[in-house]
């Protein structure tokens, strides 16, 4: 064996050991979250009673609901009607929708609704200003009068009690933000939409629930989420220099010791992407932004005096969640080297463990989400498609990482809608 081959063998073996350690760590994380969610009391996993304020309506905070819209003419009518159904005292509820340079009739539709809806404020940003959703929300923040800011996306349909379910957490002065649960209403539109529906069940009912239950570190998720207005202004609003303003704000709140809560019963419904192309575009944006957040905040998180050692470890694992699919691609390359005889694994058993952990952790979380989300047999059969989709995620996360390395420019890109919200909800 040449020195070059020996060097390659050593490198491959070292990388394989590193991957095994990484996959074991994330497997344990998936398992802990799944056990936490599956063993939770019924009151935390199903629709529960709302605890009204004992002192009465007079103690309720004022609320500003914000939505950023760009080319959302297919859903904007339903959005306005859904906001009109929110169950909260009218004198304490403000609604602001920002048209972010739309070119498809969204602006005209919003102006029509504003003329007939006295409590709706419509703001217009000229096209070409940049900054994406963050900049649009910051525009709304300048006009907001509410104590609590609640953000929805344009395709979302919040349930009527969602505002009350959010604001009840702010009786605790330590709480700075609250994340609700989003469910998919169009799972039957395609295999991709069905997989996204399962992924959302796992993401909210298992991962987000587990982070809250085990570490008290849920994420502020960007839609169906609320934040204390004074805190948001104190940290400078949303960051217009990132395409995932939610992850960025989550980390800025954590770094100053603020508390984020997750309310599994604060539900709204949204439209999932229906094609692989749209899935790629959406998840690429998530990966690009999340990886940027890892670069921006990982050192600050690790040195944060507000966090315990376990909280720092969990925050680092959360930060690098969109790096793990890249490890899938590295593992695939290693498998190719082993299969072609260019390199050999140290131990065949270790190779088996590596590939098992690669899929078992995510499947544990997805399986728990399938059960807790009340999914049917069609959804269970669709689980088989998660394996190829996992490799797709690995490819897009790798591309996002490489594009950042070479400093390829990327602007915020909205998710295309297919139709108005009239599909069956998967909750």
Question: Residues of each region from the PLM?
Answer:
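Acidic helix N-cap motif at the loop->helix transition within catalytic regions
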Residues: 77, 104-112, 124, 161
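Catalytic donor-sugar/metal-binding loop of nucleotide-sugar-dependent glycosyltransferases
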Residues: 250-268
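N-terminal signal-anchor transmembrane helix
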Residues: 32-92
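Acidic donor-binding loop at a coil-to-helix junction in glycosyltransferase catalytic cores
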Residues: 243-249
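A conserved acidic beta->alpha catalytic loop
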Residues: 90, 99-108, 127-130, 157
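Long helical/loop segments within the catalytic core of UDP-sugar-dependent glycosyltransferases
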Residues: 114-126, 130-147, 160-243, 280, ...
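Membrane-embedded multi-pass helical conduit in multi-pass membrane proteins
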Residues: 37-40, 47-50, 55, 318-407
């Amino acid at each position: 064996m040449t020195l070059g081959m020996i060097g390659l063998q050593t490198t491959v073996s070292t990388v394989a050991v590193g991957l095994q350690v990484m996959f074991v760590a994330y497997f344990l994380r998936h398992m802990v979250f799944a056990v936490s969610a599956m063993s939770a009391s019924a009151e935390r996993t199903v629709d529960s009673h709302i605890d009204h304020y004992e002192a009465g309506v007079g103690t309720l905070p004022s609320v500003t609901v914000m939505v950023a819209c760009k080319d959302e003419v297919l859903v904007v009518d339903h959005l306005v009607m859904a906001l009109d159904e929110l169950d909260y005292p009218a004198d304490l509820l403000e609604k602001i929708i920002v048209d972010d340079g739309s070119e498809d009739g969204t602006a005209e539709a919003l102006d029509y609704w504003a003329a007939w809806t006295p409590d709706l404020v419509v703001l217009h940003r000229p096209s070409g200003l940049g900054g994406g959703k963050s900049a649009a929300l910051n525009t709304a923040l300048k006009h907001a009068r509410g104590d609590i800011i609640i953000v929805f996306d344009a395709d979302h349909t919040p349930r009527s009690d969602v505002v009350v379910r959010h604001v009840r957490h702010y009786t605790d002065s330590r709480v700075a933000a609250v994340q609700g649960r989003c469910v998919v209403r169009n799972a039957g539109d395609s295999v991709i939409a069905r997989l996204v529906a399962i992924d959302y069940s796992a993401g909210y009912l298992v991962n987000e629930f587990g982070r809250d239950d085990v570490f008290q570190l849920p994420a502020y998720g960007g839609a169906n989420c609320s934040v204390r207005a004074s805190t948001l202004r104190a940290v400078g609003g949303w960051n217009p220099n990132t395409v995932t303003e939610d992850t960025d704000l989550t980390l800025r709140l954590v770094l100053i010791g603020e508390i984020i809560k997750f309310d599994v019963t604060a539900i709204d419904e949204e439209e999932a992407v229906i094609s692989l192309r749209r899935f790629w575009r959406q998840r690429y944006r998530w990966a690009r932004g999340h990886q940027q957040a890892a670069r921006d905040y990982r050192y600050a998180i690790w040195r944060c005096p507000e966090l315990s050692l376990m909280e720092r470890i969990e925050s680092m694992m959360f930060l690098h969640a969109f790096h793990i699919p890249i490890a899938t691609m590295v593992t695939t390359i290693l498998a190719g080297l082993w299969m072609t005889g260019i390199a050999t694994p140290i131990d065949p058993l270790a190779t088996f463990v590596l590939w098992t952990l690669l899929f078992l952790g995510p499947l544990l979380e997805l399986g728990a989400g399938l059960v807790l989300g009340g999914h049917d047999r069609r959804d269970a059969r669709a689980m088989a498609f998660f394996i190829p989709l996992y490799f797709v995620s690995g490819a897009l996360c790798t591309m996002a990482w490489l594009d950042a390395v070479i400093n390829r420019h990327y602007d915020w890109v909205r998710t295309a809608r297919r139709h108005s919200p009239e599909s069956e909800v998967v909750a």
